[in-house]
A protein has these predicted regions:
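Catalytic-loop region of hydrolases
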Residues: 2-4, 25, 44, 48-50, ...
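Short, surface-exposed "cap/lid" segments of acyl-processing enzymes
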Residues: 181-190, 194-240
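C-terminal catalytic histidine-bearing segment of alpha/beta-hydrolase fold enzymes
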Residues: 456-457, 464-510
Length: 510
């Protein structure tokens, strides 16, 4: 077994949280059946190709997805049994125990209303101040490209700049019942929930979509901060009549004393699944949203989370929920190759490859050491400690060599990265075949932070099972190219493209 949520030694799993999973390394010719002693058991397996491990007897990653009706204070076993083409038998048993159901529930921590006249001005104020702070450009470079960015705003961000808000909006910071990365109960996770103020709304029509916003790097939506692009975006959608749910990643907001589950798709998805269920079951929101249809929107880290949530809802979500739209841009969908590209750059073996071409030691490497590595090394059994991988904020040269030469010590770390890589799914049809969602994907050839091939590979995979709109031109205009040629600073094009993606998503939700 590679990984599981909950971990196998957990004895107090919240019985109200019915979704769980475990992943194993396996040979490709293994057929598997799942069974369990829990009531209402349903299970399926997501298979991924597995690359660059020292072991030659395993070449696939089996992610077993489960749902059960649990009782309190009860032990359970889930069994994955099967045989290879040579009739050799394999079996994996996943065991855990439930405790007493948590008394925690969806709790409103903070709440206020924002007039629609103020909402109309939020994004324009962000462009004039917070955006350039986020870009952190030198004064000389900012002077060169400020006009280019303002021209881009005029051409590509019109819905954000002039949103024509229909309603005042209530902003809520909430906490909810969920789980820590090891599967133990948690009541500390937080989120922002936004919706129109119905008391001042005339002729309001209940919407048939709930909008799930998956935040990008550095955002904490529950802070309800009007300089945070994701808080602003949540207001804009809510001002058009939608119920908007915007979770904080574990490690932000109410759990900010812990490492973030950064790009850990399964754990982020399970937390979000728990949140959505509690919001939609709460009658306080029933006048705003009535139905079972879901739209998921994310960019960068959030774009990765959006695809991960879509996959989780198709494999483990309630049967009556239906994902209708997914918007994902600038995301490391091939997380393994993205990290490998960093290693190749540091090793000097890049040779202009698509995943290492623009790696920058000032910006890209800290994304690995400060954001990606801490969660994977803290919450999963890779056999590695953080100090084995990082020393004085740099990736250890010995670890880089071990990673690129397929040293056995790196096997589980590599496999965990691949468990969060969507481009390695063997069959989109097996996992998304029943979905009616339209998936919008946005890359930029000028993005120095997240390589273009991440999105290209995912589009090629998903189009076999889903309706995919690959917006290749959205962030590849002459304006983006001009900015790309003026500055080599990593993250500038990435950030600007994100705003174009969000502008398009907002345009689709009248």
């Amino acid at each position: 077994m590679l990984d599981s949520v909950p971990q196998g030694d957990i004895a107090n799993v919240d019985p109200a949280l019915s979704a769980s999973s475990f992943a194993v390394l396996a040979p490709s010719d293994l057929s598997v059946e799942l069974s369990s002693d829990c009531n209402g058991f349903t299970g399926n397996t997501t298979r991924r190709s597995l690359f660059d491990l020292s072991a030659t007897d395993v070449d696939q990653l089996f992610d077993h997805n489960l749902r059960c009706d649990f009782n309190e204070n009860t032990g359970y076993t889930v069994t994955a049994s099967g045989a290879r083409s040579n009739d050799a038998a394999f079996i994996t048993e996943f065991t855990f125990s439930t405790g007493v159901a948590s008394s925690a529930s969806l709790t409103i921590v903070d709440e206020f209303d924002l007039p629609r006249t103020d909402i109309n001005d939020l994004f324009a104020a962000y462009i004039g101040d917070a955006l350039f702070d986020d870009l952190a450009l030198s004064s000389g470079v900012e002077a060169l490209i400020r006009q280019l960015i303002l021209e881009l705003a005029d051409a590509s961000w019109s819905n954000l700049v002039d949103p024509e808000a229909l309603y005042d909006v209530t902003s809520q910071k909430v906490s909810y019942r969920s789980r820590h990365p090891d599967g133990t109960p948690s009541a500390e996770l937080t989120a922002a929930v936004m919706f129109p103020v119905l008391a001042t709304a005339s002729n309001f029509v209940t919407r048939d979509r709930v909008v799930i916003l998956m935040h990008a790097t550095g955002s904490t939506p529950s802070n309800l901060d009007n300089t945070d692009a994701w808080y602003i975006l949540a207001n804009l959608f809510a001002s058009r009549g939608y119920l908007v749910i915007t979770p904080d990643n574990y490690g932000r907001g109410g759990t900010d004393n812990m490492p973030e589950t950064y790009l850990m798709a399964k754990r982020t998805g399970l937390n979000t699944l728990d949140l959505i269920g509690q919001v939609l079951d709460d009658t306080r929101y029933s006048e705003v949203y009535s139905g079972a249809d879901i739209a998921i929107i994310g960019y960068s880290q959030g774009g990765h989370s959006a695809v991960g949530l879509h996959l989780l809802l198709e494999t483990q979500g309630p049967d009556h929920w239906s994902v209708k739209e997914v918007y994902s841009g600038g995301a490391p969908h091939n997380l393994y190759q993205t990290v490998r590209g960093v290693m190749q750059h540091l090793d000097g073996s890049c040779d202009d490859g698509p995943y290492c071409r623009y790696v920058d030691e000032e910006t890209t490497v800290p994304y690995a050491t400060d954001r990606i590595f801490p969660g994977f090394l803290s919450y999963t059994d890779t056999g590695l400690q953080f100090e084995d991988v990082v020393t004085n904020e740099d990736i250890n040269p010995a670890f880089v060599t071990a990673f690129l030469t397929d040293d056995p010590v790196t096997d589980h770390f590599k496999a965990m990265l691949q468990l969060s890589s969507f481009t390695q799914l063997l069959s989109a049809e097996d996992n998304f075949g029943a979905s009616t969602a339209k998936v919008h994907l946005y890359p930029s050839e000028f993005d120095r932070l997240v390589p273009f091939d991440n999105t290209l590979e995912l589009a090629n995979l998903l189009e076999t099972a889903l309706t995919v709109d690959f917006h290749e031109r959205r962030c590849n205009s002459a304006g983006y190219e001009a900015i790309f040629n003026v500055t080599e600073k990593v993250g500038v094009i990435h950030t600007l493209c994100g705003l174009s993606v969000l502008n398009q998503a907002l345009a689709d939700f009248k």
